Amino acid sequence: MKTAHEIRPGNVIMLDGSPWVVQKTETTRSGRNAAIVKLKLKNLLLNSGTETTFKGEDKLEDIILDRLDCTYSYFADPMFVFMDAEYNQYDVEAENLGDAAAYIVDGMEETCQVTFYDGKAISVEMPTTIVREVIYTEPSARGDTSGKVMKPATITGGGTVTVADFVKVGDKIEIDTRTGEFKKRV
């Protein structure tokens, strides 16, 4: 058990019978009152989010989930199948992947972290950055160079990313999977 003000982003807490990962914490202290801790949480079973508030001294049950490095194997509707180094396969429901599903492609070489709760694979964490090919984007607009010009691009896997104007079809780009932002052309 930890007090609310000891909880940090990345911790997993048990709340209302479900595991929640802490995405953001904000502590507010006022003169005579005790600290108030505001937590932004994501439910690992339902892939939904919420914000909630606790008193600083409230006790929260922190849990440690098993995580395993795996590679993407194949898609069997509605499951994404991942494989570990010992060739064990783990099914993760497509709805539990959230935004990560747009970055998963056949033949990807990046290693993902599969999270387990009660022996069941419940979520997948992508690497911080990945490289994908642009399969569609509009041509750059000539003369439109005032400031930072951005445009939408479709990448392998079907996701859409806002890229710099100089990026064209066939370019490989680096993407931050936490924010979905274009980092650079590779």
Curated annotation (Swiss-Prot):
SUPFAM superfamilies: Nucleic acid-binding proteins (SSF50249), Translation proteins SH3-like domain (SSF50104)
Pfam family, one: EFP_N
GO molecular function, one term: translation elongation factor activity
Subcellular location: Cytoplasm
Organism domain of life: Bacteria
Pathway assignment: Protein biosynthesis; polypeptide chain elongation
Keywords carried by this UniProt record: Cytoplasm, Elongation factor, Protein biosynthesis
Biological-process GO terms, alphabetical: peptide biosynthetic process
Listed InterPro entries: Elong-fact-P_C (IPR015365), NA-bd_OB-fold (IPR012340), Rib_uL2_dom2 (IPR014722), Transl_elong_fac_P/YeiP (IPR020599), Transl_elong_KOW-like (IPR013185), Transl_elong_P/YeiP_cen (IPR001059), Transl_elongation_fac_P (IPR011768), Translation_prot_SH3-like_sf (IPR008991)
GO cellular component: cytoplasm
Family: Belongs to the elongation factor P family.
Annotated NCBIfam families: efp, PRK00529.1
Primary role: Involved in peptide bond synthesis. Stimulates efficient translation and peptide-bond synthesis on native or reconstituted 70S ribosomes in vitro. Probably functions indirectly by altering the affinity of the ribosome for aminoacyl-tRNA, thus increasing their reactivity as acceptors for peptidyl transferase.
Name of the molecule in the record: Elongation factor P
Native source species: Shewanella baltica (strain OS185)
